[in-house]
Amino acid sequence: MINYPEPNRTYKHYKGGLYKVLFLSKHTETSEILVNYQSILFGSYYSRPLESWNEPSPGGENRFTLIEY
């Protein structure tokens, strides 16, 4: 099952950083779905393939976990 992160929601990375998902997009050449997100602390922007977003961390836990407020 594919887990699609929700835009405008905050996720915690397994290393501790907090990130806001901005939107999902599609790579123009490969059609791969990308997760576009922003660091809450630094304001930096990132894009990561959805497959990578959903991969477990090296320790086996979720790479990103939805933070419920």
Residue ranges and their predicted role:
Residues 17-26:
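Short beta-strand-centered aromatic/proline hotspots
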Residues 14-16, 32:
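Short connector loops at helix/strand junctions that flank enzyme active sites
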Residues 10, 28-30, 65:
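Residue-identity detector for threonine
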Residues 25-50:
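Basic/aromatic-rich interaction segments and small domains that mediate binding to polyanionic partners
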Residues 2-14:
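Short coil-to-beta transition motif at edge beta-strands of beta-rich domains
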Residues 44-69:
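Intrinsically disordered, low-complexity, charged/polar segments
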